[in-house]
């Protein structure tokens, strides 16, 4: 079930195509696959043709998979990714939160790093909301991890099936919302089997990195964790092209070979800005912000039960120091991005106070009460 911005049930139907148009579209997807195999970049119009074909059931899953594999084999460009994002943004369910979007931030990761880390971004959301920021998080249940952002936030009391009207009230009363991706992107329905088949054979596709670019709330600011260093400049450029107000794309390098889709105190972090921060291109470490380097083991998470217990430990001041500092660092960066603090360093101690001083625990309790009512 999905909802329109007034909270009424809405069913998505692909736009109709006549038989001649359909034939052209089917041949176009095959033709585009051939062009990709030769190394040619797709235009925005060609991306739209391909995206529309992927949304329907007219092309076989094999044809769709061949196209996505050819695109990945060529290597998706920032322009192609931005063009795909525009198509799917236009077909997302509108939650009607435009009044908050210009002040809002999304704290999100691409996933897919297989690092087994804790749901850092979920607690960062709660710190930022406690600081007075407006947060619009967009995500899903765990796919390559045992516990995704949706899993943890649901465990903390968030109703994943809340109507847009309820979510608008959450923005007023809690300062944050979570857009559960399956409820806002019905156009993905006919793509899901293809993605599953590709994943089964270890093949990534553009859809592995598209989620953070198609938040239905359209927040003006984004702090994006990226699973691969090579994708940092591409996704920053794509978000810049999409008109994002400000933000950073970041990738943490664990030991020179492994990486994580987080900015952490245990890694050297490649960062690239976009929007107002587009001139930032740097490598950051914890020490740049007055924090200590930590072992990566401090960031490890588990399944939902384990992560809920770890959340309790963090809030009680018993969590691993590296995990606490990483949550604090990301929250401080988020505050700086949205303008709540003039520098990241200025936000570090404030974020720590909110996390460990009871404000986040109170936010979680308020969240449970809000969604239970």
Which residue stretches match the model-derived regions?
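N-terminal amphipathic/basic-hydrophobic helices that include classical n-h-c signal peptides
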Residues: 1-25
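Short glycine-rich or small-residue beta-strand-to-loop segments that form or flank ligand, phosphate
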Residues: 37, 68-72, 105-111, 334
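Short amphipathic alpha-helical face segments that pack within enzyme cores
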Residues: 66, 123-127, 326, 330-333
């Amino acid at each position: 079930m999905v909802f329109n911005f007034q909270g009424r049930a809405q069913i998505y139907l692909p736009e109709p195509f006549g038989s001649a148009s359909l034939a052209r579209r089917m041949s176009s997807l095959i033709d585009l696959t051939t062009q990709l195999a030769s190394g040619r970049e797709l235009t925005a119009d060609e991306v739209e043709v391909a995206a529309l074909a992927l949304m329907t059931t007219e092309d076989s899953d094999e044809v769709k998979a061949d196209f996505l594999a050819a695109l990945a084999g060529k290597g998706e460009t920032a322009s192609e990714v931005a063009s795909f994002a525009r198509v799917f943004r236009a077909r997302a369910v509108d939650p009607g939160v435009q009044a908050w979007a210009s002040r809002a931030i999304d704290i999100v990761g691409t996933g897919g790093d297989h690092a087994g880390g804790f749901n850092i971004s979920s607690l960062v959301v709660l710190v930022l909301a406690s600081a007075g920021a407006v947060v619009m998080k967009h995500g899903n249940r765990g796919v390559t991890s045992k516990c995704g952002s949706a899993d943890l936030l649901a465990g903390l009391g968030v109703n994943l099936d809340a109507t847009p009207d309820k979510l608008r009230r959450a923005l007023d009363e809690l300062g944050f919302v979570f857009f559960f991706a399956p409820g806002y992107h019905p156009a993905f329905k006919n793509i899901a089997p293809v993605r599953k088949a590709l994943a089964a054979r270890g093949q990534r596709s553009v859809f592995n990195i598209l989620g953070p670019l198609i938040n239905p709330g359209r927040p003006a600011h984004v702090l994006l964790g990226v699973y691969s260093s090579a994708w940092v400049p591409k996704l920053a450029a794509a978000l810049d092209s999409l008109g994002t107000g400000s933000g950073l794309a970041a990738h943490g390098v664990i030991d020179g070979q492994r990486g994580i889709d987080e900015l952490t105190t245990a890694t050297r972090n490649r960062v690239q800005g976009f929007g107002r921060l587009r001139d930032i291109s740097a490598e950051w470490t914890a020490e740049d912000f007055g924090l200590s380097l930590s072992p990566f083991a401090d960031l490890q998470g588990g399944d939902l039960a384990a992560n809920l217990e770890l959340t309790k430990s963090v809030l009680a001041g018993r969590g691993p120091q590296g995990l606490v500092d990483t949550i604090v660092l990301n929250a401080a960066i988020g505050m700086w991005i949205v303008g709540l603090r003039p520098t990241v360093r200025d936000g570090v101690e404030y974020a720590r106070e909110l996390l460990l001083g009871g404000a986040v625990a109170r936010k979680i309790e308020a969240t449970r009460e809000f969604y239970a009512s």
